């Protein structure tokens, strides 16, 4: 027997930018498809016209490509099972709506929103979970037809609802969660499959699309568990075999332990925000893959090829995945250290230009200087936009030292080191990192001061910071004139404060 051809889909709604949670869904489907040499489908679920954002689908596709996620079929690539936008499939949905109506498995419902809300209020008052109750209960076929014609004559527009069989259990063996089942009386009554504007509801359209596109596995977020029994109702009514379902656990904020919500401003949640900060796509791919999936071994840095080779949905976590910002920064730093320097230069240059620190068209000499600047900070950056704050001393006039910096150098040793180092700088033939380090060693010999008491006063006086890249490289890029100016400012500030 031939092995089943794996077909998965990622089906976003174009309601805004690509969210971390949606990116994870896309990524896991991508890895599953590639691991099994299957097919990944991109489908745009834009049936809810009110929620769609102009350019939303384009933005999401661009960010998926940036992450390194590609697909085999979709609105931009075509395929044998299109169209791949729900808004272009209305006639297809109507065919199956008509089939269910003709078979008596669905019906027109003319209850207004006001009547439905009144019904829900009554149920709440009785302590009953709100649910739809069949509006034609006890009526004959002729009476139902007459009631519908009267409603139609009043200008009321109907929805189409699907009959939910009574006393039935809907169950599936979830790839992540194991066996799950729901009783039909917990679904909420006959639910809408076509809205008043003629567009299908999500739980109907997704079934038709998945079946016709021959989707074999559906990997999606935990929030879709409650949709699955409704979709199984539709599968059963249409006589179709459902795909295998897998529901990934929620992503939580590692600081608060709460579900990652778009209202939680303590965490950046959209891929575009990380792009703007200068995160690398391979690092984001790596980090997101580890949100709820565990590779073999202790290593946490993998190539895309390694992830594809290892990916097994059986290793998807049953516990919520914690979004740890510090871990993301660590992973991105690992990738920055190994990144192509031209890539880092482009990202950092863009960040510096956005901050107004570098002209739009720098000279070749300036570009080479910026390249060296990026190189000395690369090992420290968690993302490239950090260079704007890290390297401000290279672009702005020196400010007075902070109280913490003054505290570090206010003793006699501090002044002695700074004054001697200034003398030694005048003795070096060329202002290069190697020569500068030689001047520091000469200062050590002249003063007898070493270690932190030697290097910290030199760093603070010359770069106006207690931390930073290699001190020799930093001073070389600052240039001798600025370094000496910084030293003079430091000595003046110490004198002004009687230090």
UniProtKB/Swiss-Prot annotation:
Entry GO CC: cytosol
Biological-process GO terms, alphabetical: glutamyl-tRNA aminoacylation
Enzyme class, first EC level, given as a word: ligase
The keyword Cytoplasm appears for this protein: yes
Pfam families: Anticodon_2 (PF19269), tRNA-synt_1c (PF00749)
EC number: 6.1.1.17
Residue positions binding ATP: 262
Compartments where located: Cytoplasm
GO molecular function: ATP binding; glutamate-tRNA ligase activity; tRNA binding; zinc ion binding
Sequence motif: 'HIGH' region, positions: 12-22
Chief location category: cytoplasm
Record flagged with keyword Glycoprotein: no
Ranges spanned by the short sequence motif 'KMSKS' region, renumbered to the chain: 259-263
UniProt keyword annotations, A-Z: Aminoacyl-tRNA synthetase, ATP-binding, Cytoplasm, Ligase, Nucleotide-binding, Protein biosynthesis
Catalytic activity field: tRNA(Glu) + L-glutamate + ATP = L-glutamyl-tRNA(Glu) + AMP + diphosphate
Family as reported in the entry's similarity comment: Belongs to the class-I aminoacyl-tRNA synthetase family. Glutamate--tRNA ligase type 1 subfamily.
Subunit structure: Monomer.
Function: Catalyzes the attachment of glutamate to tRNA(Glu) in a two-step reaction: glutamate is first activated by ATP to form Glu-AMP and then transferred to the acceptor end of tRNA(Glu).
Protein known as: Glutamate--tRNA ligase
Organism: Lactobacillus acidophilus (strain ATCC 700396 / NCK56 / N2 / NCFM)
């Amino acid at each position: 027997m031939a092995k089943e051809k794996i077909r998965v889909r990622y089906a976003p709604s174009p309601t805004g930018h690509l969210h971390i949670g949606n990116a994870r869904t896309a990524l896991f489907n991508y890895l599953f498809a590639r691991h099994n040499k299957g097919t990944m489908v991109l489908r745009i679920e834009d049936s809810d016209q009110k929620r769609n954002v102009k350019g939303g689908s384009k933005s999401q596709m661009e960010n998926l490509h940036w992450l390194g996620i590609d697909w085999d079929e979709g609105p931009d690539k075509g395929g044998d099972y299109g169209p791949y936008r729900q808004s272009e499939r209305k006639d297809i949905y109507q065919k199956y709506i008509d089939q269910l109506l003709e078979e008596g498995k669905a019906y027109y419902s003319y209850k207004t929103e006001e009547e439905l809300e009144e019904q829900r209020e009554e149920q709440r008052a009785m302590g009953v979970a709100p649910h739809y109750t069949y509006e034609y209960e006890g009526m004959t076929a002729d009476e139902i037809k007459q009631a519908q014609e009267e409603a139609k004559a009043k200008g009321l527009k109907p929805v189409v609802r699907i009959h939910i069989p009574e006393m039935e259990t809907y169950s599936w063996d979830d790839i992540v969660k194991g066996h799950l089942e729901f009783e039909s009386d917990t679904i909420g009554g006959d639910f809408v499959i076509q809205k008043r504007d003629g567009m299908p509801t999500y739980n109907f359209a997704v079934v038709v699309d998945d079946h016709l596109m021959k989707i074999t596995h559906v990997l999606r977020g935990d929030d879709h568990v409650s949709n699955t029994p409704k979709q199984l109702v539709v599968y059963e009514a249409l006589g179709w075999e459902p795909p295998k379902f897998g529901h990934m656990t929620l992503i939580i904020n590692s600081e608060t332990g709460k579900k990652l919500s778009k209202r939680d401003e303590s965490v950046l949640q959209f891929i575009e925000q990380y792009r703007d900060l200068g995160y690398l796509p391979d690092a984001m791919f790596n980090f997101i893959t580890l949100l709820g999936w565990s590779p073999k071994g202790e290593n946490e840095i993998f190539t895309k090829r390694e992830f594809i080779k290892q990916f097994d949905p059986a290793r998807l976590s049953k516990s919520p995945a914690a979004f740890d910002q510090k871990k993301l920064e660590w992973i991105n730093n690992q990738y920055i250290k190994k990144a192509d320097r031209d890539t880092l230069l482009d990202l950092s240059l863009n960040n510096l230009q956005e901050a107004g620190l570098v002209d739009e068209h720098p000279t070749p000499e300036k570009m080479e200087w910026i390249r060296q600047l990026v190189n000395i900070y690369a090992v420290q950056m968690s993302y490239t936009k950090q260079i704007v704050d890290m390297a401000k001393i290279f672009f702005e006039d020196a400010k007075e030292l902070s109280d913490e910096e003054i505290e570090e150098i206010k003793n006699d040793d501090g002044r002695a080191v700074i004054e001697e180092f200034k003398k030694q700088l005048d003795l070096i033939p060329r202002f290069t990192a190697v020569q500068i380090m030689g001047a520091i060693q000469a200062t050590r010999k002249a003063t007898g001061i070493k270690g932190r008491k030697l290097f910290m006063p030199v760093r603070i006086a010359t770069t106006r910071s207690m931390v930073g890249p290699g001190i020799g490289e930093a001073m070389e890029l600052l240039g001798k004139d600025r370094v000496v100016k910084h030293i003079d400012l430091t000595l003046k500030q110490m004198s002004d404060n009687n230090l």
